[in-house]
From Swiss-Prot:
One of its GO terms (cellular component) is cytoplasm. PROSITE patterns: HTH_LUXR_2 (PS50043). It comes from Escherichia coli O157:H7. Induction: Negatively regulated by H-NS. Positively autoregulated. Also positively regulated by IHF. This is HTH-type transcriptional regulator EcpR. Residues 162-181 bind DNA. Belongs to the EcpR/MatA family. It is found in: Cytoplasm. Pfam families: GerE (PF00196). Keywords: Activator, Cytoplasm, DNA-binding, Transcription, Transcription regulation. GO terms for molecular function: DNA binding. It comes from the Bacteria. Residues 138-196 form the HTH luxR-type domain. Part of the ecpRABCDE operon, which encodes the E.coli common pilus (ECP). ECP is found in both commensal and pathogenic strains and plays a dual role in early-stage biofilm development and host cell recognition. Positively regulates the expression of the ecp operon by binding to two TTCCT boxes.
Length: 196
């Protein structure tokens, strides 16, 4: 990858983060037109099921699309995007392959709830349930990534090899592979496919 491509990607990520902080951008990523339009219409559609006004939702909430296209960005910059949404009610919309990561962020940060897009029979009710503040730890439907697995996922996303990860984590290469396999089972995919 060239320097210019790296620069463009960094600019794009910063631009996404800026959009996320603006009060009129309550759905991330605003550049994913189908998701943005679909979720906007869905929120208006469930107006009668939610207790808060649409204006309050636009002002206080951030809805984040955790799909396979954006996972690397969220993994590599989780401290950045979590600080960027501080003070907001964050709702993660998780695709099947990102459910375990969504659960990790729910347990380890101030996330209001997770909507499991792949499991939901009625996404309207699931979304209203989370917006209304009823999502609790008992509602977690899948495994979550452990702290050690998350560290290994982050380092893998940065392009590090298992031997280097083992050195940094002060463990054997076999242990790194075991954690990777466990994470891959929870994510329904090989790590290298998710973080490319």
């Amino acid at each position: 990858m060239t320097w210019q491509n790296d620069y463009s990607r960094d600019y794009e990520v910063e631009n996404h983060m800026e959009c996320q902080n603006r009060s009129d951008k309550y759905i991330w990523s605003p550049h994913d037109a189908y998701f943005y339009k679909g979720l906007s219409e869905l929120i208006v559609d469930i107006d009668r099921l939610i207790y808060l006004s649409l204006e309050k939702i636009r002002k206080d909430f951030v809805f984040i699309n955790l799909n396979t296209d954006s996972l690397t960005e969220f993994i590599n910059r989780d401290n950045e995007w979590l600080s960027a949404v501080k003070g907001k009610q964050v709702v993660l919309i998780a695709a099947r392959k990102s459910e375990a990561l969504a659960n990790y962020w729910y347990y380890n940060s101030n996330i209001r709830g997770v909507v499991y897009a792949g499991l939901s029979r009625d996404i309207r009710k699931e979304l209203a349930y989370v917006i209304n503040g009823r999502f609790l730890r008992k509602d977690i439907k899948k495994d979550k990534i452990t702290d050690r697995e998350m560290e290994i996922i982050r380092m893998t996303a940065q392009g590090m090899l298992p031997k280097s990860i083992a050195r940094i984590e002060n463990c054997s290469v076999k242990t790194v592979y075991t954690h990777r396999r466990n994470a891959e089972a929870k994510l329904y995919s090989k790590l290298y496919k998710l973080v490319q």
